[in-house]
Amino acid sequence: KKGVTLREDDRFPCNAGNCACLPLDSYSYTCQSPTSSTANCEGNECRSEADW
């Protein structure tokens, strides 16, 4: 998994179909499959492009 930094233009940082997870120990979003566990994500949440 590649980390993605928060960009100032605030575009969705992941490919379509993936979701953005903000790990509890990081300030950079990571992209993961929507079926992945969100246990390590802030708010137990992985945000899809629709939620972005």
Curated annotation (Swiss-Prot):
It comes from the Eukaryota. GO terms for molecular function: ion channel regulator activity; toxin activity. It is found in: Secreted. Residues 1-6 form a propeptide. Keywords: Disulfide bond, Ion channel impairing toxin, Neurotoxin, Secreted, Toxin. Expressed by the venom duct. GO terms for cellular component: extracellular region. Transmembrane segments: none annotated. Its main location: secreted. Disulfide bonds join C14-C31, C19-C41, C21-C46. The cysteine framework is IX (C-C-C-C-C-C). Probable neurotoxin with unknown target. Possibly targets ion channels. This is Conotoxin Cal9.2c. It comes from Californiconus californicus.
